[in-house]
From Swiss-Prot:
UniProt key word Transmembrane: no
Stated role: Covalent carrier of the coenzyme of citrate lyase.
Recorded family membership: Belongs to the CitD family.
Sequence positions bearing O-(phosphoribosyl dephospho-coenzyme A)serine: 14
Official protein name in the record: Citrate lyase acyl carrier protein
Assembly and oligomerization: Oligomer with a subunit composition of (alpha,beta,gamma)6.
Subcellular location: Cytoplasm
An example Gene Ontology CC term for this record: cytoplasm
UniProt-listed InterPro entries: CitD, Mal_deCO2ase/Cit_lyase_ACP
Keywords attached to this entry: Cytoplasm, Phosphoprotein
Amino acid sequence: MKINQPAVAGTLESGDVMIRIAPLDTQDIDLQINSSVEKQFGDAIRTTILEVLARYNVRGVQLNVDDKGALDCILRARLEALLARASGIPALPWEDCQ
């Protein structure tokens, strides 16, 4: 999946996460995480984000994650919505990502 434009998904409310994405000129993934629960769940948050990016074959992006204690399912949903917005597609290709 090609990220064409910057995008934002989520809120800064308790129990939610705000994620910002922007395309990079390289194939690197620049991941910055700021979380109220980073000491306990920082590795799990990072793993979840990288799993979703790998599933949709996303490379060459800068991600800024401001987590306020979001559950894993919320993190995944926000990230998938963000990828759809940033790539300019109306819906994710669910059948291709199994």
